[in-house]
Amino acid sequence: MTQTLTQRKKRTDRNHIIYELVVNGLNYIGVTAKTESTVNKSVLSRAAKHFYRAKKEDKNWLLCAELRKLSDKSEIEVYVHEVIRGKAAAHKREVEIRRMVCPVLNTDTRGD
């Protein structure tokens, strides 16, 4: 008797986190997938990626410009707004939050 393993379908409804970064008193709203064991670790990991990109890549985005003024990533204030199941729902809710909060450092305002 031969058994064949069937591939299970990859989940498409993972948790996403809507977060806020405060850099030099200016705020940024973003969304990221929950990739680490906890929500906080996932958001801190995403903030570290923002910091790395600002230092290593030549992006002229407002967020990157403000992050370059910092000496260490620990100077970034991180807040979690919501955890939402599903990518589409999370991005829709992020737009709603951006409209309410009016963050200064968001340059990509698709949906606003």
Where are these regions (language model features)?
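GIY-YIG nuclease catalytic motif and its immediate N-terminal context
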Residues: 1-41, 92
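Boundary/linker segments flanking structured domains
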Residues: 1-14, 47, 70-112
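Polar/charged alpha-helical tracts
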Residues: 24-25, 62-69, 92, 96
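Conserved short loop/helix modules at catalytic or binding sites
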Residues: 33-87
